Amino acid sequence: MARPNPIIPGFNPDPSIVRVGDDYYIVNSTFEYLPGLPIYHSRDLDNWALIGHVANRPGQFKGAGVKPPGGAWAPTIRYRDGIFYVVVTDFFGRGNLLFTAENPAGPWSDGIELAIGGIDPDLAWDEDGTCYLSVSGLSLGSHEGFEGHNGISQVRINHITGEVLEEPRHLWQGSGLMFAEGPHLYHIGDYWYLLTAEGGTDRGHAVSIGRSTDRKSTV
């Protein structure tokens, strides 16, 4: 049987997915448009239904006056200990934000501002419960282009309060293409895998993955 492609038609860029039991949830970028950060649900990965939005009221995002290409960039959705998390960049707005909800359909929190620059944030947990936030190294509001980009960086954070617990450390520059972005970190077996996008957003766009037995040093 042919599977539907696209699985979610229309304007749904930068998908992030999480599995919770038999359920799958996807969140997407929405940039300057509100309501923002739609949450889709499926049980078979083929048929998806919109169940809510993370950003659906004033104050969660800067919103008014944000022009392209500002707004919600490259969210990540995760689940841990009964709580759903969405971490996202409000570009030209509030910066990197952490939203939480007990029900993925909402309501979602107002969003905690994270004291770290960069874009395309990701969350991952170690076996001992330590939470790591990874970001692409483009400065918020920067107009420097690719020259000032410093690859993928990472910090430990308190995922309850949003407190950043250490200075950012460099994790990976990428495979050699320019502008490593969109990091997603996974701990599978003996390895940490760092999935990234590279090469800009034109014809050279690519997906790269590095792995390491040491979370602090992806190779």
What residue ranges belong to the model's regions?
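Carbohydrate-active catalytic/glycan-binding domains of CAZyme proteins
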Residues: 1-219
